[in-house]
Amino acid sequence: MISRDDITGLILAGGRGSRMGGTDKGLQPLRGVPMAMHTLMRLSAQTGAVLINANRNLAAYESFGVPVVTDSVPDFAGPLAGMLAGLEQCQTGWMVTAPCDSPFLPTDLVQRLAQAIETEDAELAIPVTIDADGRRQTQPVFCLMPASAIDSLVAYLNGGGRKIETWAASHRLVEVPFDDAAAFANINTLDELHMHESEKRAG
């Protein structure tokens, strides 16, 4: 069984925030708290350690009280570059990732991904949800992987690859069904952020 203490959580906050007008998504307040802090609180309860991947506003992220790692791959190469930065610093046998703008991620996310890896003898696990229209949606930016995956990730990135799904599919991959698609909602725009703020006030 993969123990909680052998899993490092990695919050991916290294993007450009282009869909949010270039602002740093992880530092945008939701209910008065930075979004990345909401994600940190959810993820840290499920893992032995937590890292944050960020490429700007490092002091702000360091104030969260966990180590901050920056991309070693240049030019904002996407979430896989952030995953590599995490794996380069990971001190446990496993690492699980989550984007900084996922403040509602399931509280049993890591446990269920780890259990599926054990049951299916898989290497990587990602969630899959069914949206309101009945469409099956994989959530590859939420990924539990062994620390040893660093070698294949380096090779994939060096070959110009940037898609999580393609890299993940090169491993023994298990997709784990989750009923609550809203728990994986990313807040990508300021309008979406304001919508969630309004829902909170209305409730």
From Swiss-Prot:
Keywords, in A-Z order: Cytoplasm, GTP-binding, Magnesium, Metal-binding, Molybdenum cofactor biosynthesis, Nucleotide-binding, Transferase
Sequence positions that bind Mg(2+)? 101
GO MF annotations for this entry? Answer: GTP binding; metal ion binding; molybdenum cofactor guanylyltransferase activity
Q: What class of enzyme is it?
A: transferase
Which biological process, per GO, is one annotated for this protein?
A: bis(molybdopterin guanine dinucleotide)molybdenum biosynthetic process
Q: Which GO terms describe its cellular component?
A: cytoplasm
What parts of the sequence cross the membrane? none
Catalytic activity, per the record? Mo-molybdopterin + GTP + H(+) = Mo-molybdopterin guanine dinucleotide + diphosphate
Entry keyword Cytoplasm: yes
Database matches in PANTHER family: MOLYBDENUM COFACTOR GUANYLYLTRANSFERASE
UniProt lists the family membership as follows: Belongs to the MobA family.
Query: Can you quote the domain comment?
Result: The N-terminal domain determines nucleotide recognition and specific binding, while the C-terminal domain determines the specific binding to the target protein.
Q: What is this protein called?
A: Molybdenum cofactor guanylyltransferase
Species of the source:
Cupriavidus metallidurans (strain ATCC 43123 / DSM 2839 / NBRC 102507 / CH34)
Gene name, per UniProt, is mobA
